[in-house]
Amino acid sequence: MKLTLFLLTICVLTAAPDPRFAFRELDGGRLELRENGAPVFVYNYGPQLKLGVPEDRHRSSYLSPVYTPAGAIVTDDFPADHYHHRGLFWAWPVVETQGKVYDHWMNMTALARTVKTPAVQESPQSASLQADNVWVADGKEIVREALRLTAYPAQKDSRELEVELTLTATSAPVTLRGSREQGKSYGGFSARFAPRQGTIVRADGEVLIKDEDLVPRRWAELEGIYNGKRAVLRITPDPADLNAPYQWCLRNYGFVGASFPGRTASSDGYTLEPGKPLTLKFRVKVTDLP
């Protein structure tokens, strides 16, 4: 009896624990992260296009769906009102290089492509994903995009993600600009939210009754009820980022975007130079609410 208990104890102590985080490959160039068996997000590294959507809306290098710890899906992809919106994404409507103008936002004349399958690491403390992408325009690589994404364990009702994005022009300067529409400058790190009820948009602790553009904010979030589950997603740019605090594009229909480089009297674009990388960092927090 004592020997049996001893052997059982040894087996329990030496058994490899199940990892808290685990990535798994899905079809169509997608990587899913799970925490203790529950989905966290899907990173779409291969080209994605929904049936019935125009060909020029295909895209890659973005997160969707994104889940709360309780399983609420808070992001949307290919929404009918803005096919080009795509979960958590980073894109610019105006990309200029060598006298030509391309679109990395909607019509995708500058398209992000994956160089190789993303590298992943898993541990009880975090899970990380590193992806090397290139922006291709007219068959030429114009920007190298290095993505590092880190997910941390859920703490009660919340989970945090860190996104680090490094952009480098390849052989010629590339200028990034926001929207050319008057009074707007969307373009940068953005989130499109899933259909929901009870929408509340906040920025720096202020509830916004109306949509807002070009106002500098330290953070912004959108709260809503998703299939009966109330949740909120907040985006906080790193205060050390260039041009922080950012101007924002905030929409009650379900869009929150940190505009980089924004539009001011002295600045209306940012030029990437070959050999001089630009790094932008963001923290994304998803929280289940009572």
Residue ranges and their predicted role:
Residues L3-L13:
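Sec-dependent N-terminal signal peptides
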Residues L7, H84-D157:
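Extended, loop-rich substrate-binding clefts of extracytoplasmic carbohydrate-active enzymes
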Residues A16-H84, P173, S179, T287:
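Beta-strand-rich N-terminal accessory domains
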Residues Y43-G46, P54-D56, A154-R202:
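Acidic (Asp/Glu-rich), glycine- and aromatic
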Residues L51-Y102, A203-W219:
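Extracellular/lumen-exposed scaffold segments
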Residues N133-A137, L149-P153, L167-S171, F193-Q197, ...:
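Beta-strand elements of well-folded, non-transmembrane domains
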Residues R180-G228, V232:
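Glycine-rich (often Gly-Gly/Gly-Pro-rich) flexible segments and glycine-rich loop motifs
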Residues R234-P290:
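Beta-strand-rich recognition/accessory modules
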